[in-house]
Amino acid sequence: MCLPHIKKTNYGRIINIASTDGKRYRESVSVGYSMVKHALVSMSHATRIAGWNDGIRVTAICPGAVDTNLLNGIPGVTTSKQRLKPETIAHTVSYVLSLPKNASVAELPINARVESTI
């Protein structure tokens, strides 16, 4: 893990891109995918706490469906028009990175549509 190296600088930002499926379980999503995204969110929180006193800030960004080739051809997935654009996620990452040390975002769900959970 990079944490020991970042601690030496007394400053750092770690952004993990998880998923809204790391915040809930849906029957239409693979258990393995959901499990990995839950683990990534949990690891982000553990790393955030472990690095806090060394000036390290960690954020788990949890987007909904993003308009990439990954989702093409999967039945039951939102249409391209309903998905988040990759640029939206990039802008969000840029914003989180611009925050001062005393304004830490632990996790940030980004929905592309009305969600009943999160």
Residue ranges of model-derived segments:
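Residue(s) in the substrate-gating loop at a strand-loop-helix junction
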Residues: S19
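Active-site loop immediately N-terminal to the catalytic Tyr-X3-Lys motif
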Residues: R24-V31
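Short, flexible catalytic-loop segment of classical short-chain dehydrogenase/reductase
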Residues: P63-G73
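ABC ATPase "signature
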Residues: N10, K23-R24
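Amphipathic alpha-helical dimer-interface segment in Rossmann-like NAD(P)H-dependent oxidoreductases
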Residues: M1-K8, I49
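Active-site helix of classical SDR
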Residues: V36-K37
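C-terminal helical subdomain
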Residues: N53-I56, A60, G76-I118
